[in-house]
Amino acid sequence: MATNYIFVTGGVVSSLGKGIAAASLASILEARGLDVTIMKLDPYINVDPGTMSPTQHGEVFVTQDGAETDLDLGHYERFIRTKMTKANNFTSGKIYSEVLRKERRGDYLGATIQVIPHITNEIKARVIEGGKGHDVAIVEVGGTVGDIESLPFLEALRQLAVDVGREKTLFMHLTLVPYIPTAGEVKTKPTQHSVKELLSIGIQPDVLICRSDRMIPANERAKIALFCNVPERAVISLKDVDSIYRIPALLKSQGLDDFVCDRFRLTCKEADLSEWEQVLYQQANPTGEVTIGMVGKYVELPDAYKSVNEALKHAGLKNRLTVNVKYIDSQDVETKGVEVLQGVDAILVPGGFGYRGVEGKIRTAQYARENKIPYLGICLGMQIALIEYARNVAGLTQANSSEFDKHCPQPVVGLITEWQDESGNVETRSDESDLGGTMRLGAQQCHLIEGTKAREVYGTETIVERHRHRYEVNNTLLPQIEAAGLKVSGLSADRKLVEIIEVPNHPWFIAAQFHPEFTSTPRDGHPLFEGFVKAAKEHQGKNA
């Protein structure tokens, strides 16, 4: 069957939740037995978000094949079973880079390179390639209609609708329908103007998703349908909800999936959303709560740790617990002391880059170790735990990472210069390598040592987890640290790189070089986070 395309755009304001809406629709279509994928087209000029500040852009989500992508791809994977790849996210920067590379190579035979047709053709080619082999490909365009940066993408999608046929494409537009308290009613004019903006570039939306803080009355939906030239059944009300996992049922109740299937003439079963009903039941019926102290350097923007936050919630569902996250700036630990860590049931130190706040994280790891508080370290959080143990237990008092001190006399963590990827290829890097796209990225196999807490938590000998880092444990100094009691519980497939460490005489102290949060989902959870949240509850019980 040829691929059907749903193009998702946003209007009026940004941050309306296009990614969540797209993922929710995808989950309903998947529940109807369709093979669905989702793509995100980002208009910014960066080649990828890998070198962007987390406090500006939010987290960088890493796919199985090692793409550094927009955090929306994390939402996609949490809502549907399809795994994202490099084909599921591309930016203006990536498109322009490829077109310029082809021009230098002579592919265009001396033609004058222009936005139309060269840039738009490259966008279309990537969308078609990303949708191959799927029944439905949902394509989300970042930004807001009217932004100059989005124009090449919108023009490419307009052309693509003509190329593949309007019967195989559907334009879904998210808009804001604000409620004005003084008038006591919702206002549809912003939506009308947003659709007018789309029409000016040749796109007639087929479905309107109207975001508001309440359900939009039938008479207002009829008004929107009339003025925006869409069927009344295609005007969908999407109100604010207390859980994003309610949205699939909310969209289904208004017949959005039926409209899509009718449009594409797809014959498929009714959607079974029982898995999502189970998620919502677990969420609504907790038997207790725990507080996790997350000690990081980007805590002013929780989206910088989006997948970690979601993984903690998923672990809460599996343990029937509400998980509260207390964000603690690691610099506050440096200036105010470990008192800021009091009152938490467990401590999590997530990934990060750069020296700022590192000493606060080291003091945090020491506090968790000495006070028997459950600790989960992720990426930098593992390196921090290693440095702390080396300094305070193994006698390597000048231990540090060469990331923070290039002339450190005891570099227990150093730049990784060579490793083997999942395909068996050897990757090499040096201090002179570019920052962008040069880390150890993507899914890697990890061997778990028998008799360790990590092996017990996962319940298997071999796991596959995703990486995003350029520094690793220095094997030269490792024997001295192990002799002091630290346990290596996970190794890379070739047994050369340390992937997991743990403190044996501790209720729950595990730190991993990889990012387990990227593979956690609300339906399946993740064993490492589930074990961590369970340990937090047990610690809470001991201190009650």
Curated annotation (Swiss-Prot):
Cellular component, GO annotation: cytosol
Transmembrane segments: none
Active site (UniProt): C379, H515, E517
Any GO BP: pyrimidine nucleobase biosynthetic process
MF annotations from Gene Ontology: ATP binding; CTP synthase activity; glutaminase activity; identical protein binding; metal ion binding
Source taxon at top rank: Bacteria
PROSITE patterns in the record: GATASE_TYPE_1
Pathway membership, UniProt: Pyrimidine metabolism; CTP biosynthesis via de novo pathway; CTP from UDP: step 2/2
Binding positions (CTP): S14, D147, I148, E149, K187, T188, K189, P190, T191, Q192, K223
Enzyme class: ligase
EC number assigned by the record: 6.3.4.2
Catalytic reaction list: UTP + L-glutamine + ATP + H2O = CTP + L-glutamate + ADP + phosphate + 2 H(+); L-glutamine + H2O = L-glutamate + NH4(+); UTP + NH4(+) + ATP = CTP + ADP + phosphate + 2 H(+)
Domain Glutamine amidotransferase type-1: 291-542
Residues where UTP binds: S14, K187, T188, K189, P190, T191, Q192, K223
Binding positions for L-glutamine per the UniProt entry: G352, L380, G381, M382, Q383, E403, R470
InterPro entries listed in its UniProt record: Class_I_gatase-like, CTP_synthase, CTP_synthase_N, GATASE, GATase1_CTP_Synthase, P-loop_NTPase
Binding site for ATP: S15, L16, G17, K18, G19, I20, D72, K239, D240, V241
Keywords linked to the UniProt accession: ATP-binding, Glutamine amidotransferase, Ligase, Magnesium, Metal-binding, Nucleotide-binding, Pyrimidine biosynthesis
Pfam families xrefs: CTP_synth_N, GATase
Gene3D superfamilies for this protein: 3.40.50.880, P-loop containing nucleotide triphosphate hydrolases
Annotated binding of Mg(2+), by residue: D72, E140
Note: CTPSs have evolved a hybrid strategy for distinguishing between UTP and CTP. The overlapping regions of the product feedback inhibitory and substrate sites recognize a common feature in both compounds, the triphosphate moiety. To differentiate isosteric substrate and product pyrimidine rings, an additional pocket far from the expected kinase/ligase catalytic site, specifically recognizes the cytosine and ribose portions of the product inhibitor.
Subunit structure: Homotetramer.
Function: Catalyzes the ATP-dependent amination of UTP to CTP with either L-glutamine or ammonia as the source of nitrogen. Regulates intracellular CTP levels through interactions with the four ribonucleotide triphosphates.
Family stated for the protein in its record: Belongs to the CTP synthase family.
Protein name: CTP synthase
